Curated annotation (Swiss-Prot):
Binds 1 [4Fe-4S] cluster. It comes from Bacillus cereus (strain B4264). This is ATP-dependent helicase/deoxyribonuclease subunit B. Gene3D superfamilies: 3.90.320.10, 6.10.140.1030, P-loop containing nucleotide triphosphate hydrolases (3.40.50.300). GO terms for molecular function: 4 iron, 4 sulfur cluster binding; 5'-3' exonuclease activity; ATP binding; double-stranded DNA binding; helicase activity; metal ion binding. The keyword Nucleotide-binding applies. It comes from the Bacteria. It holds the Pfam family PDDEXK_1.
Length: 1171
C-alpha cells in the first residue's frame, strides 16, 4: 500500500505519464492484477479512447476507466448491495414532491416556496450536498437545536426555521430510501463500505487523474482505495514551488494544494507509505511559444509580456450572432487551410443558454460537425407535454390552454390520418372552442355541441343552414378525437385506489394512443432528414417515461394519492427528465461549458462570450442557503460546498485551466450586444491577456461585409447556405451606392447561384427580394367586379375604412379576412348591448305613447334591469352568464344603462326634441327601411351606402320641422371637420342627409325637414370629484355635465333653445353650444349654418363618389393615413398581412395636416364649389 503524487502545471504531461505507464504495463503483463483508472465523469469517454489509442494496446481486460459512480456499480455487482432499486434525479424529485406535499402544514419556510419553479431541483441538490459532505439528518437536527437556542435576530430565526424544514425533509427522504432505494449519492457511500470486500480492487494499481478537489465523501473513497490498492497514483495540477510555501488562498493553485495536503493527511492516518512526489517541469503540450508563455506566467504580477508572434487571437463582435459566425469561419479555415481535424478544435463558453441554439443553427449552416455537451431537458418533447397537459386537463377541469397544449403534441391524432389535414381541422376546431368559450363540463357532457354563426342581437332565427350543419358534424367528430382518450384515462384515475393503478391509467392512455408507433414514425422522419441526434430523442423519451412510471410504482405503488398530488408529483418527475448526450461521431467540434469540461488533446480552443459578469463569473447567491448562512453552519462544524467567496477565489484557477487547454492556437472573443441588442461589456480578463501579448491586435467581427477589405470579404464566402445572405448584402449596397470594381468576385459568387442546377431555384426567391417593393398592385376591373360585385353595397364605416387605408378595405371587404372570434366581451359587444338596451326601452315607451321625460327614477332602474336580463342570453353566446366575473360585469353594465336612462330622462325634460325612431335602417330593404344613398359611378357601377341610424329626434316650431341625429357611443367622441374633409368621419352627416332627404315620405305629415344637428351621446357611468360637502342635487348636476352631447348643431338660437329649453345665456349642460347676452353664440359653440350643413352634405356625396370610383377601379394602395398622433395602423387587424414597414422606401404614411374647423370648412367649400 503506497501513495504517489504526480504534480505539475497544466500541460506538463501528468495524464500522459500515467497513461504511458498503464500502456507499458499492459504491454508487458496483459493479464496481471487490476489497473483502475479513475477520472471525473465527463473525462471517461476521452480517457478510454486515449488508453487504447496506442498501437501496442488495442484493448484491455486488465485496465478499466471508471468514474466514482461507475466504480460503485462495479463493486456492488461484485460483492452485493446493488439489489436496491436505483432512483435517478427524476425519481428523487418525485419523492421529494410527495414528502413536501404531505409535510406542507408543518413547514415553516418552504410551505410557499415549494410552489416556485426549480424548488425541487434546489432541494434535491441540497440533500445531495449533505450526503457528499457526510452530513446526516441527525447532524442537521443537532444544528437546528443549536441555532434555535441562540436565535435572537430575524436572520438567525429564519436560518433556524430553514434548517428545521431541511432536517424534516431530509429525514423523511432518508427514511423513504432505507432498505429499498439508492440515489446517486448513496452509491458512493456504499462504495466506501464495500471496497474492503472487493477482490477486484484489492491489490489493484490505481490511478486517479483529472481531479482538482474531493468532497468529504469522495475523500473517504480515496482513503479506502489507498487501503485496498497496491499503489494509488494521484495527479494534481500544482506548481512544485507552491508546495514549498505556506498555503495562501490567493495562490493560483490554492485549491489543489489543499487537496494535496488533505490526501497526505489521510495517508498518514492510515499509515500508508507516501512515495516521492514526481514533479513534471516541462511543457510538452504546448507547440506554441506564446501558449507556453501564457501558461508559465499566467499568475505573474505584474503581467509578463510576450513580444514574439503570438498564436493568440482576441476579437470583439458586433453581436452574439456575428461572434458565432466568426468562430465558424475560422474553424472552416483551420480545417481547410491548416489540415486540422474537427476533433482538434473545442469551443468553451459559460452562458450556454444564450449560445447553444444559435450555435446549433449556424454550425449546421456552415457544415461543421459538432457536439454540444449539454443536458437537454425532455420537458418540450411531445410525449412529455402530452402526459403533463392531459393530467392538467383532468385535474384542472378541462381548461382551454391545457386541452390545446395536448392537442398540439399531435399524439391524440389517429394513427391512420394525414397529419396536414388533421392540423387544419384542429385549427378550425380550436377557433370554435375559443369563440364558444368551451371548457369544463362541456367537454365531458354527452350533449352534442351546437354551431351557429353569430350575427347580431336581433337575429333570433333558430334555423340551421347546411354549411352550419356540416361544420357542426365536424366539430363533434373532432371533439371525440380529443376527449375520448382523455376521458378514459380520467375515469381510470378516479377509480384507481393506488398509485400503481394511476400509473397504469397513464400507461394505458399512451398505449391506446399508439404512442410507440407514432414516436417510431417521428424517429424515421428525423433520420430521413439527417437529424440523427433528434432521431435518438424519440427512443430515449419513451424509455425514460416508462422508467419514470416504473420508479413511481416502485416507490409509492401501494400508496393512495389524490389526483392533484399525483399530477404534481408526475409533473415534477417529467420536468427532471433529460436526454443523454451521446456523441454521434468521433470527428467533431466539441462545444462545452468551461466549468464542467475536461478537455485533452486539443490543438485550438475558442473561448467565447468573455463578457463582464460571465468570465470571471459574477457572484450569485443560488440554492437553499445563502453565503452568510453557509458561513454560520461552517463555523458550527458543518462543512458544505464552497461559498460564493470561495468560488470567486477558485475562478482564477478555472480560467487558468481554460486558457491552457489548447496546444497550438487560442481564440478569445466577446460580443458587444446580445441577441436582443442589449449592450454587453468586455471582460477584464481580455485586458489581462492583452497586457501579456501587447503585439496582439484586437480584431472586430461584423456581419456587415461592406466595410471590410477584399481579402477579409473573401473569408465570408463559405457554404452556399451562408454565403447567399452576404451576396444579398452586396447587391443591396450596389443598388443603393453603385458598383465597386475591386469587389467583383461577388459577381462570381452571384453567377454560381444563378447557374447552379442545385441552387438556381433556391436562390431565385431570395434574390428576387432585392427588387421587392411592398406595393399592392392595382386590381383589374374583372377582379374588382368578382370581389365586390356589380353593385357595391356598403356601410359608411366601410367607406371611412377605405379612406383610412385602401389596403385594409381590400383585406376586410375584398378578401373577407377577419380575426378569429374569441369568447370575450369586447368594446363592440358592449356597444351593441348598449344600443339594444336603449332601443328596447325606447320601443316600450313608443308603444305606450310615453317619452323619456315620463319615467321616474325607479322606472329607469326597473327597465334597465329588465332589458339587460332580456339581452344577456343573446349576447356573444351567453357570455354574460358564463362566469361570476361576467355576472358582475353584467351588473355594472346594467348600472350604466340605469345612469344613461336617468340622463335621457333629464334631457327629455329640457328638450323640445323627441325621438322619432331608433335603429332606423336605410338601404336594408323590408318594412320601415329608408332607401339607400345611391350613386351611379362613371364606370357604370352602382353603389349603395346603407346603414342603421341610432336615433332620430324631431322638433317643430313656427319655422318648420327640424331633425337631428343622436349617435350612442361607449367612448367620448367629437365631430372633427378635418376628419370629415379627409373622409374619415362621414357617418353622422350621412345619417343626417338620409333622414332630411327622405323626410317628406318618411314622416307622417309629409313635409320637408331642416337639419338641426348631429350629436354624440356618451354612454357611461361617470365618477365626479366634488369639493366639500356637496348636496345630492349638486352631484347630479355635475354628472349631467359629463353627459353633454358633442357634435355640430344648427347655428340658430331658437333651435338650440329647443334642444335645451333651460338655456338663456351661458353654456348649455346638454349640448356643446352656448349663448351670449346679445343672443349670439359663444366662441366655443360647435355650430354650422343651414347653408354649411348643405355644403357638408354635398361634400359627403362627393367623397362617396370618389371612394366608389377608387374601389371599382381596383385601388388597394398600402397607404395608411397619419394625422398627429392618430394613424390607421394603430388598431388595424391586418398589419401582418400588408407588412407595412416605414423603413422601406415604398411604405410611408399618408400624412394629413390637422386643421381648425374653420379652415377645414373652407377647404370643403372649395371642393364642392360652395359659397
Amino acid at each position: 500500500m503506497s501513495l504517489r503524487f504526480v504534480i505539475g502545471r497544466a500541460g506538463s504531461g501528468k495524464s500522459t505519464l500515467c497513461l504511458r505507464e498503464v500502456q507499458e504495463e499492459l504491454k508487458q503483463r496483459p493479464r496481471g492484477k487490476t489497473i483502475l483508472y479513475l477520472v471525473p465523469e465527463q473525462m471517461t469517454f476521452q480517457t478510454q479512447q486515449a488508453l487504447i489509442g496506442s498501437e501496442d494496446v488495442r484493448g484491455s481486460i486488465r485496465a478499466q476507466v471508471f468514474s466514482f459512480s461507475r466504480l460503485a456499480w462495479k463493486v456492488l455487482q461484485e460483492v452485493g448491495g446493488a439489489s436496491r432499486l436505483h432512483i435517478d434525479e427524476a425519481g428523487v424529485h418525485m419523492l421529494l414532491r410527495k414528502i413536501v406535499e404531505s409535510r406542507k402544514d408543518g413547514l415553516s419556510v418552504f410551505q410557499k416556496a415549494a410552489e416556485q419553479n426549480g424548488f425541487f431541483e434546489h432541494l434535491g441538490s441540497m440533500i445531495a450536498e449533505f450526503k457528499r459532505y457526510n452530513v446526516t439528518p441527525s447532524n442537521v437536527y443537532e444544528m437546528w437545536q443549536q441555532l434555535d437556542a441562540h436565535s435572537s435576530s430575524a436572520e438567525q430565526k429564519l436560518l433556524a426555521n430553514k434548517v428545521y424544514d431541511l432536517q424534516l425533509l431530509y429525514d423523511d427522504f432518508e427514511r423513504a430510501l432505507i432498505g429499498k432505494y439508492l440515489d446517486s449519492e448513496d452509491y458512493l457511500q456504499l462504495l466506501v463500505e464495500k471496497l474492503p470486500q472487493s477482490e477486484y480492487v484489492n491489490g489493484a494499481e490505481i490511478y486517479i487523474d483529472g481531479f482538482h478537489s474531493f468532497s468529504p465523501q469522495e475523500l473517504e473513497i480515496v482513503r479506502q482505495l489507498m487501503i485496498c490498492g497496491a499503489r494509488v497514483t494521484i495527479t494534481l495540477t500544482i506548481d512544485e514551488k507552491t508546495l514549498a510555501q505556506p498555503v495562501n488562498e490567493l495562490d493560483l493553485f490554492y485549491e489543489t494544494t489543499l487537496t494535496y495536503e488533505k490526501i497526505k493527511q489521510v495517508a498518514r492516518e492510515e499509515k500508508i507509505e507516501i512515495e516521492k512526489t514526481i514533479p513534471l517541469m516541462e511543457q510538452p503540450r504546448f507547440h506554441s511559444p506564446a501558449l507556453a508563455h501564457l501558461e508559465a506566467h499566467y499568475e505573474a504580477r505584474p503581467n509578463e509580456k510576450f513580444n514574439g508572434e503570438a498564436s493568440v487571437t482576441i476579437s470583439t463582435a458586433a453581436n452574439l450572432r456575428a461572434e458565432v459566425e466568426g468562430v465558424a469561419r475560422e474553424i472552416r479555415k483551420l480545417v481547410a487551410d491548416e489540415k486540422y481535424r474537427y476533433r482538434d478544435i473545442a469551443v468553451l463558453l459559460r452562458n450556454g443558454e444564450s449560445y447553444y441554439d444559435v450555435m446549433r443553427t449556424l454550425f449546421t449552416d456552415y457544415n461543421i460537425p459538432h457536439f454540444i455537451d449539454e443536458k437537454r431537458p425532455m420537458s418540450h418533447h411531445p410525449l412529455v407535454e402530452c402526459i403533463r397537459s392531459a393530467l392538467e386537463i383532468i385535474s384542472g377541469n378541462w381548461r382551454y390552454d391545457a386541452v390545446f397544449r395536448c392537442v398540439k403534441t399531435e399524439l391524440l391524432y389517429p394513427l391512420d390520418v394525414r397529419k396536414e389535414t388533421m392540423r387544419e381541422e384542429m385549427d378550425e376546431f380550436e377557433n370554435y372552442c375559443l369563440a364558444y368559450g368551451v371548457q369544463g363540463k362541456r367537454w365531458t357532457s354527452e350533449d352534442p355541441w351546437m354551431y351557429r354563426r353569430y350575427r347580431s342581437l336581433d337575429d333570433t332565427n333558430g334555423m340551421i343552414t347546411d354549411s352550419e350543419r356540416e361544420m357542426e358534424e365536424k366539430i363533434n367528430r373532432l371533439r371525440d378525437v380529443v376527449r375520448t382518450p382523455v376521458i378514459r384515462m380520467q375515469k381510470r384515475l378516479k377509480r384507481a385506489g393506488t398509485v400503481m393503478q394511476m400509473c397504469e391509467a397513464v400507461y394505458l392512455f399512451l398505449e391506446e394512443l399508439d404512442v410507440p408507433k407514432k414516436l417510431e414514425e417521428l424517429r424515421i422522419r428525423a433520420e430521413e432528414s439527417g437529424d440523427f441526434l433528434f432521431a435518438t430523442d424519440h427512443e430515449q423519451v419513451w424509455e425514460e417515461v416508462m422508467s419514470l412510471l416504473d420508479t413511481f410504482v416502485e416507490m409509492l405503488g401501494e400508496e393512495k394519492m389524490s389526483l392533484s398530488m399525483f399530477t404534481d408529483v408526475m409533473s415534477t418527475g417529467l420536468e427532471a427528465l433529460q436526454f443523454a448526450n451521446i456523441p454521434p461521431s468521433l470527428d467533431q467540434v466539441l462545444i462545452a461549458n468551461i466549468d464542467h469540461s475536461r478537455l485533452s488533446d486539443v490543438k485550438a480552443t475558442f473561448i467565447i462570450g468573455v463578457n463582464e459578469g460571465v468570465i470571471p463569473a459574477a457572484p450569485m447567491d443560488e440554492g437553499m442557503l445563502s453565503d452568510e448562512e453557509r458561513e454560520v453552519l461552517g463555523a458550527a462544524g458543518i462543512e458544505l460546498a464552497p461559498t460564493t467567496r470561495q468560488t470567486l477565489l477558485e475562478e482564477q484557477f478555472v480560467m487558468y485551466q481554460m486558457v491552457t487547454r489548447a496546444s497550438e492556437k487560442l481564440y478569445i472573443s466577446c460580443p458587444l450586444a446580445d441577441e436582443e441588442g442589449k449592450t454587453l461589456l468586455a471582460s477584464s480578463f481580455i485586458k489581462k491577456i492583452k497586457r501579456m501579448f501587447p503585439n496582439v491586435k484586437d480584431s472586430f467581427i461584423t456581419n456587415d461585409v461592406n466595410d471590410l477589405s477584399r481579402s477579409e470579404q473573401i473569408s465570408y464566402v463559405a457554404t452556399p447556405e451562408v454565403t447567399l445572405s452576404y451576396v444579398m448584402q452586396q447587391l443591396q449596397t450596389w443598388k443603393r451606392y453603385g458598383f465597386e470594381g475591386n469587389l467583383d468576385f461577388w459577381w462570381d459568387v452571384y453567377n454560381f447561384y444563378v447557374t447552379s442546377d442545385e441552387w438556381k431555384q433556391k436562390s431565385s426567391r431570395v434574390l428576387s427580394s432585392l427588387f421587392y417593393r411592398n406595393r399592392a398592385k392595382k386590381l383589374s376591373t374583372a377582379v374588382s367586379r368578382d370581389l365586390y360585385g356589380d353593385i357595391i353595397k356598403g356601410s359608411v364605416s366601410r367607406m371611412e375604412l377605405f379612406n383610412r387605408c385602401a389596403y385594409a378595405h381590400f383585406a376586410q371587404h375584398g378578401l373577407s379576412l377577419r380575426e378569429r372570434d374569441i369568447f370575450k366581451l369586447d368594446a363592440p359587444d358592449i356597444g351593441e348591448l348598449f344600443h339594444a338596451a336603449l332601443k328596447k326601452i325606447a320601443d316600450k315607451l313608443l308603444r305606450e305613447n310615453r317619452t323619456w321625460a315620463d319615467l321616474s327614477i325607479k322606472e329607469c332602474e326597473h327597465l334597465s334591469v329588465l332589458v339587460i336580463e332580456e339581452i344577456a342570453p343573446l349576447l356573444q353566446r351567453q357570455i354574460l352568464l358564463s362566469s361570476n366575473r361576467h355576472f358582475y360585469l353584467k351588473q355594472k353594465l346594467q348600472q350604466i344603462i340605469f345612469r344613461t336612462s336617468i340622463i335621457l330622462r333629464e334631457h327629455a325634460k329640457s328638450s323640445g326634441f323627441v325621438p322619432v325612431d331608433l335603429e332606423v335602417p336605410f338601404g336594408m330593404g323590408g318594412t320601415g327601411s329608408l332607401p339607400p344613398m345611391e350613386f351611379s359611378l362613371p364606370n357604370g357601377v352602382k353603389m349603395e351606402v346603407v346603414g342603421r341610424i341610432d336615433r332620430v329626434d324631431k322638433a317643430e316650431d313656427e319655422n318648420g320641422t327640424f331633425l337631428r341625429i343622436i349617435d350612442y357611443k361607449s367612448s367620448s367622441k367629437v365631430l372633427d371637420l378635418t376628419e370629415v374633409y379627409y373622409g374619415l368621419a362621414l357617418q353622422m352627416l350621412t345619417y343626417l342627409d338620409v333622414v332630411t332627404s327622405n323626410a317628406q315620405t318618411w314622416m307622417k305629415k309629409g313635409h320637408a325637414a331642416s337639419p338641426a344637428g348631429v350629436l354624440y351621446f356618451h354612454i357611461h357611468n361617470p365618477i365626479v370629484e366634488m369639493k366639500g360637502d356637496a348636496s345630492e342635487a349638486e352631484i347630479e348636476k355635475e354628472i349631467l355635465k359629463k353627459f353633454k352631447m358633442k357634435g355640430l348643431v344648427l347655428g340658430d338660437a331658437d333651435v338650440v333653445r329647443l334642444m335645451d329649453n333651460k338655456l338663456s345665456t351661458g353654456s348649455s349642460d346638454i349640448i356643446s353650444a352656448g349663448l351670449k347676452k346679445d343672443g349670439s353664440f359663444s366662441a366655443r359653440s360647435s355650430i354650422a349654418s343651414e347653408q354649411e350643413f348643405n355644403v357638408l352634405q354635398k361634400y359627403v356625396h362627393h367623397t362617396f363618389e370618389n371612394i366608389g370610383k377608387d374601389i371599382t377601379e381596383g385601388v388597394i394602395d398600402i397607404a395608411p393615413y397619419k394625422m398627429g398622433n392618430k394613424a390607421a395602423c394603430t388598431f388595424c387587424n391586418f398589419k401582418s398581412v400588408c407588412q407595412f414597414d416605414e423603413s422601406l422606401e415604398d411604405n410611408q404614411f399618408r400624412s394629413l395636416k390637422d386643421m381648425k374647423d374653420s379652415e377645414a370648412m373652407e377647404k370643403i367649400r372649395e371642393e364642392v364649389g360652395g359659397e
